[in-house]
């Protein structure tokens, strides 16, 4: 009957939850071992590369405890690293990353960055990486990398997402996006300022100006990452 089915379903869910917990614990142990190796200068990574591309993002997840009761949302930090793109597959119109490795966790930012650096050291000779290019969504925790010389770029997808979410006028969206795509950050910020002022309204329900200023503040806060490295005159091997 239905009560029996629900009971079996609950048992199955608990079993899956337990398996996932054990798997997570094992992965965490491996990550901690890599951190210890890094601090002891015994990391396994030997490969030397001219450039390492890194991407970091935060994803907010709805959480449940073992009894499937709702818990407050937590941010899962996601890190992806790769050496570049497969030239042959690019010619065929397919994008494929070379040497892609991922890491994810719910730790505090300091601990996550420690595991992230250990993940890099497990695969590469970190001291011999010529340049590190870091793409991120602008989250505050992303600005805490081990390598202060990493070049930061604001992730284009998140910029487009912010423009669409904060600017209601389609024409203004296109103008802002075009200024961003053509590498004109100063003109873009000025345009948003003018737009935000032009849509001010005495109607408290009209949030157009407020949202435009929020977009401005987001981009201004991440000003250093608005231009991709190649448009800054930075050459990498």
Please tell me what each predicted stretch does.
Residues 3-4, 80, 181:
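Compositionally biased, low-structure terminal segments
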Residues 1-12:
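Single conserved hydrophobic/aromatic residue that forms the stacking wall/gate
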């Amino acid at each position: 009957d239905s009560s029996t089915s629900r009971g079996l379903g609950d048992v199955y869910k608990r079993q899956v939850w337990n398996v996932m917990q054990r798997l997570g614990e094992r992965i965490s142990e491996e990550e901690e071992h890599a951190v210890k190796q890094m601090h002891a200068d015994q990391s396994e990574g030997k490969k030397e590369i001219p450039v390492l591309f890194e991407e970091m993002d935060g994803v907010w997840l709805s959480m449940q405890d073992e009894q499937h009761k709702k818990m407050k949302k937590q941010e899962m930090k996601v890190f992806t690293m790769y050496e570049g793109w497969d030239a042959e597959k690019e010619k065929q119109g397919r994008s494929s990353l070379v040497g892609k490795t991922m890491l994810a966790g719910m730790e505090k930012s300091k601990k996550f960055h420690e595991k992230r650096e250990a993940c890099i050291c497990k695969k590469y000779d970190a001291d011999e990486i010529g340049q590190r290019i870091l793409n991120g969504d602008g989250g505050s925790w992303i600005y805490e990398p081990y390598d202060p010389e990493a070049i930061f770029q604001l992730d284009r997808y998140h910029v487009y997402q912010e423009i669409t979410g904060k600017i209601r006028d389609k024409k203004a969206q296109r103008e802002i996006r075009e200024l961003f795509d053509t590498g004109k950050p100063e003109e873009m910020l000025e345009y948003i300022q003018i737009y935000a002022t032009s849509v001010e309204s005495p109607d408290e329900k009209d949030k157009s100006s407020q949202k435009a200023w929020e977009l401005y503040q987001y981009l201004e806060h991440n000003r250093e990452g608005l231009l991709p490295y190649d448009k800054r005159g930075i050459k990498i091997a």
